[in-house]
Regions:
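Post-Walker A alpha-helix
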Residues: 42-43
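Glycine-rich, often acidic-flanked micro-motifs
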Residues: 20-34, 48-199
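Conserved lysine of the Walker
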Residues: 39
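Extreme N-terminal, non-catalytic leader segments
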Residues: 1-26
Length: 199
């Protein structure tokens, strides 16, 4: 689908990441996390506070420019996140719920707000995010080696040698963070700092 959308061959993509691409002020960062870690919920919260959803779950990156491309898919919201998001998205109360049998999940879909964002933008870093009600808040920078170990299992990376070399060079220059939170307001405030280069 992404190849048809942007008229690009598979060889022209650096990779596709299982992440949320979040944009603000011309910057884009990729938020990654295991299922149940709050990745899509945090994306919806950030969208409600001035950030843009560039893509959710399926994030394509161009091999030539290493830019993140917009992907027009809705944000999947799990049942247990509905109460948290209803104050910002009342439409979720009446949205149809779907049962994803293979994953044993019940989800509703939230349209992304990204009409004003460009179709592509440079990546400014990776954030490995996790909601943990029992853990203290922390946001720490991690090495690109540790980050690489985290992204590979859930990503498609081009097997072409030139693209692989480009990816390694590009990824080694990215800022990578691990963000653990138990308070939504604190998480949003910290992400604002990331986009303002205050960390």
């Amino acid at each position: 689908l992404v190849q048809v959308l942007y008229q690009k061959k598979e060889t022209e993509w650096l990779g596709v990441f299982h992440a949320s691409a979040v944009g603000k002020n011309g910057k884009c960062m990729l938020f990654l996390g295991d299922s149940g870690n709050g990745k899509s919920t945090s994306l919806a919260l950030l969208q409600a506070h001035g950030f843009e959803c560039i893509a959710d779950d399926f994030v394509p990156v161009d091999a030539h420019s290493q830019e993140v491309y917009k992907f027009p898919a809705a944000i999947s919201i799990k049942r247990n996140s509905i109460p948290v998001l209803l104050p910002y998205y009342p439409i979720l109360e009446i949205s149809e719920e779907f049962h994803l049998k293979q994953l044993d999940k019940h989800v509703r879909y939230l349209p992304p707000v990204n009409e004003l964002s460009p179709n592509k933008m440079p990546c400014d870093g990776f954030v490995f995010i996790k909601y943990d009600a029992k853990a203290p808040f922390s946001c720490t920078q991690i090495s690109s080696v540790r980050a690489f170990e985290k992204i590979v299992p859930d990503s498609w990376l081009s097997p072409i040698a030139a693209n692989a070399a480009t990816f390694l060079n590009w990824f080694s220059k990215q800022r990578c963070y691990e963000l653990i939170y138990n308070d939504n307001s604190e998480m949003i405030s910290e992400v604002h700092k990331l986009y303002s280069d205050e960390l």
